[in-house]
Regions:
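Electropositive, glycine- and tryptophan-enriched low-complexity nucleic-acid-binding patches
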Residues: 30-108
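Extended amphipathic alpha-helical interaction segments
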Residues: 101-177
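Electropositive nucleic-acid engagement tracts
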Residues: 1-52
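DNA- and nucleic-acid-binding/regulatory domain cores of transcription factors and nucleic-acid enzymes
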Residues: 1, 76-78, 150, 154
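Compositionally biased, intrinsically disordered/low-complexity regions enriched for serine, proline
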Residues: 15, 76-78, 128, 170
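Structured beta-strand/turn binding interfaces of compact recognition modules in eukaryotic regulators
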Residues: 12, 23, 46-49, 65, ...
């Protein structure tokens, strides 16, 4: 069986949905160049974005600091390795991050910043396999989680939610971007 060069790993255990890791050599080279640069490192971010039937998709993204957008001057966001998996647990994320840590083991982890939402298993595996990297959380996810807790779990009225929210982020909790 010949595999496409973008499909780098397919594996399954017991009665679990198979895991698939997708990336190419260019993505790994660029992550090494842009996410480990001491002077202008890009954050390598991961987010379990959506569910396709029984499969979750966890893409990674980074900024290509060698390119600037003409209209804004910002660096464009590029897609990094993608992880397809059936469970969002430490076993699955551990396989993914151990694989990535082997690919990046010749890099200085202390220069690396990893970003994610606050999903526990994802965060634990990032910390376990990249122990010297800086872990940062996505503000948008934190804001949404706080809004949801204040509104749905605690049941605070909009006025109190706005007051608390504004004290932390200087904006209203019902504003999504």
């Amino acid at each position: 069986m010949t595999m496409d060069s973008f499909i780098r790993f397919v594996g399954a255990s017991q009665s679990r949905v198979p895991n698939v890791m997708l990336y190419d050599d260019r993505q790994i080279r660029e992550i090494k160049a842009f996410c480990f640069a001491a002077d202008s490192a890009s954050v390598l971010s991961f987010d379990k974005t959506f569910n396709l039937e029984s499969i979750y998709v966890t893409p990674s993204v980074y900024k290509n600091t060698a390119v600037n957008r003409k209209c804004t001057g910002d660096h464009p966001v590029f897609l990094g390795p993608i992880f397809l998996h059936g469970h969002s647990d430490r076993l699955n994320y551990g396989m993914f991050f151990s694989h990535l840590s082997l690919l990046l083991m010749d890099c200085n982890q202390q220069a690396l910043m990893l970003g994610s939402d606050d999903e526990t298993a994802l965060h634990q595996c990032m910390q376990a396999f990249f122990p010297r990297a800086a872990l940062i959380s996505c503000t948008r996810h934190l804001q949404e989680n706080v809004r949801q807790q204040l509104e749905e779990r605690i049941g605070l009225c909009l006025e109190l939610r706005c007051s608390l929210y504004n004290g932390v982020w200087r904006r209203r909790p019902d504003v999504t971007h």
